[in-house]
Amino acid sequence: MTARRREAAPAKKRRNLLKSLGIERVDYKDTSTLRQFISERGKIRSRSVTGLTVQQQRQVTTAVKTAREMALLPYPGQNPTGR
């Protein structure tokens, strides 16, 4: 008997969020935009999830880390509910 192979599902097209918003430079003070790149637990989302380029991912990472230093965004592990 020959085994049947499953056909692979078509690859999901990743959308570049920064490009769709028309943002060229990421600013650490723009917390509403930065929150879109942070998970519910406060971790920075990966490129495979966000669809950013390498340079854009570096900008987002630097901006998020700076915003955390300035206490504009929470660090991962800090639970806002106090649990």
Swiss-Prot record:
State if rRNA processing is listed as a keyword.
no
Q: Which domain of life is it from?
A: Bacteria
Enumerate the Gene Ontology biological process terms: translation
- Gene Ontology molecular function terms on file: small ribosomal subunit rRNA binding; structural constituent of ribosome
Give me the Gene Ontology terms describing cellular component.
cytosolic small ribosomal subunit
Any keyword Oxidoreductase? Answer: no
Keywords for the protein's UniProt record, in alphabetical order: Ribonucleoprotein, Ribosomal protein, RNA-binding, rRNA-binding
Protein family? Belongs to the bacterial ribosomal protein bS18 family.
Role of this protein: Binds as a heterodimer with protein bS6 to the central domain of the 16S rRNA, where it helps stabilize the platform of the 30S subunit.
The protein's assembly and partners: Part of the 30S ribosomal subunit. Forms a tight heterodimer with protein bS6.
Tell me the HAMAP family matching this sequence. Answer: Ribosomal_bS18 (MF_00270)
Protein name (database record): Small ribosomal subunit protein bS18A
Look up and give the organism this protein is from. Mycolicibacterium vanbaalenii (strain DSM 7251 / JCM 13017 / BCRC 16820 / KCTC 9966 / NRRL B-24157 / PYR-1)
